Amino acid sequence: MGTALHETNSSEVHVSEFILLGFPGIHEFQIWLSLPMALLYIVALGANLLILITIYLEPTLHQPMYQFLGILAAVDIGLATTSMPKILAILWFDAKTISLPECFAQIYAIHTFMCMESGVFLCMAIDRYVAICYPLQYPSIVTEAFVIKATLSMLLRNGLLTIPVPVLAAQRQYCSRNEIDHCLCSNLGVISLACDDITVNRFYQLALAWLVVGSDMILVYASYALIIRSVLRLNSTEAASKALSTCSSHLILIMFYYTAIVIVSVTHLAGRRVPLIPVLLNVMHIVIPPSLNPVVYALRTQELKVGFRKVFSLSEFVSRK
C-alpha cells in the first residue's frame, strides 16, 4: 500500500493505484468462490471457441443467423476475459492492486463488451423476428451485407459512446481513499472514491444505460412479443410449441442479463457503498451469460450440432487434409 498514494505537497495526496478488496463482507471466505469462477471462465472460453471454429469451418453455417451467433461468441470471450483473470488473481494470489490506467482500461473494455452483448441480442431478436414473421422476405432482408452493416454499426456505436466513461473517470481527483470494495473496476465504484464532484459521471452513466442498453432492451422485448404473437397464430401446434420453447429459453437469458444490469446500476446510483449482492450480480452477469449463451443459443440448434460433429470428426479432418 505504500506505493498507492503519492504526496505532492504537505496537504495534498494523490492516488496512483487502486486496491480491489474483492467481494464485500466475505473477504476471508471468498477463496471458495475461485473454483466456480474458474470453471465458468473455462466453460466460457472453451464453448465459445468451439462455436467460433465450427461456424468458421462449416460452409453450411455461413448464414446470418449463425454469423450473429459467432459474433456473440466472440463478444462473450471478450466480456469474460476483461474481468475474470483479474478476479482470479485477487482470489488466488491476493493481487489486489491495479494501476489507474489499467483500471480505466478495464472500465472501458467492460462497458464496450456489455454494450456489444446488448447490441448482438438486439440483432438476433431482429433476425428471428424477420425469419418468423416475414419468412418469404427473410433472404432478401437479412443478408450478409446486413450482418456486416449491423456489426460495424454496433462497433461504432459502442466504441464511441463508451469512451467518455473512462475519460470522465480519469479526470476526477482521487486524493486519499483508494480501496474499492469490489473485485473489478466498476465505474461507479471507482468514482465514488473521488474527492471532487462526480455529478457529470453519474449523469453520463445513467444516460448511457438508458440510451444504449435501455433502448436495446425495449426493442428486444418488443421483437419477442411480436414473435410470440405470430407464433400463437400458427396452425401447426408442433411448430408453435417448438418456436415458443426456443423463444422462452432466449428470454430467460435476456431477462437475467438486463435485470442484473438494472439492479447494479440502480444500487450504485442510490448510494456510495457497494453491498455484496449487487457486486455478485455485477460479476455473475459478466461470467454466467458467456457460459450459458453457447448452450441456449447454439448447442440447442440442430444445424450447429451437426456442423460441430462434421468439423471435429476424425474422418472429416482426414478428408480435409
From Swiss-Prot:
One of its GO terms (cellular component) is plasma membrane. One of its GO terms (molecular function) is olfactory receptor activity. Signal peptide: none annotated. Keywords: Cell membrane, Disulfide bond, G-protein coupled receptor, Membrane, Olfaction, Receptor, Sensory transduction, Transducer, Transmembrane, Transmembrane helix. Residues 1-36, 92-105, 150-207, 272-275 are extracellular. Disulfide bonds join 103-185. It is found in: Cell membrane. It is a multi-pass membrane protein. SUPFAM superfamilies: Family A G protein-coupled receptor-like. InterPro entries: GPCR_Rhodpsn, GPCR_Rhodpsn_7TM, Olfact_rcpt, OR51/52/56-like. The chain crosses the membrane at residues 37-57, 71-91, 106-126, 129-149, 208-228, 251-271, 276-296. It comes from the Eukaryota. The keyword Lyase does not apply. Pfam families: 7tm_4. GO terms for biological process: G protein-coupled receptor signaling pathway; sensory perception of smell. Residues 58-70, 127-128, 229-250, 297-321 are cytoplasmic. Belongs to the G-protein coupled receptor 1 family. Odorant receptor. This is Olfactory receptor 56B34. It comes from Mus musculus (Mouse). The gene is Or56b34.
